[in-house]
Amino acid sequence: MSMVYVNISLAFTLSLMGLLMYRSHLMSSLLCLEGMMLSLFVMMSITIMSNHFTLASMAPIILLVFAACEAALGLSLLVMISNTYGTDYVQNLNLLQC
């Protein structure tokens, strides 16, 4: 495994650890999710280019489209929650409230 793959895997792992450890604010969770998607995109692109997978060359673009949709939905939820509750704390979001 080359150093590029190690660095990208480390970036994904650090983003995942950040998502698991710092989930008090919704904005930090969204940033960690974006870091995970970026590292997955780079890993897929490098793997497809190095192994000459011509049939899978659209997969990184599709992943990027899903990442953009996820970011748009996350930011719209962040705006809605901050307008409703005044903060972006995840602890305030109790799904059992009616």
Swiss-Prot record:
It is found in: Mitochondrion inner membrane. The chain crosses the membrane at residues 1-21, 29-49, 61-81. It comes from the Eukaryota. It is a multi-pass membrane protein. GO terms for biological process: ATP synthesis coupled electron transport. GO terms for cellular component: mitochondrial inner membrane; respiratory chain complex I. Keywords: Electron transport, Membrane, Mitochondrion, Mitochondrion inner membrane, NAD, Respiratory chain, Translocase, Transmembrane, Transmembrane helix, Transport, Ubiquinone. The keyword Cell membrane does not apply. Its EC number is 7.1.1.2. Pfam families: Oxidored_q2. It catalyses: a ubiquinone + NADH + 5 H(+)(in) = a ubiquinol + NAD(+) + 4 H(+)(out). The keyword Electron transport applies. Belongs to the complex I subunit 4L family. Core subunit of the mitochondrial membrane respiratory chain NADH dehydrogenase (Complex I) which catalyzes electron transfer from NADH through the respiratory chain, using ubiquinone as an electron acceptor. Part of the enzyme membrane arm which is embedded in the lipid bilayer and involved in proton translocation. Core subunit of respiratory chain NADH dehydrogenase (Complex I) which is composed of 45 different subunits. This is NADH-ubiquinone oxidoreductase chain 4L. It comes from Procyon lotor (Raccoon). The gene is MT-ND4L.
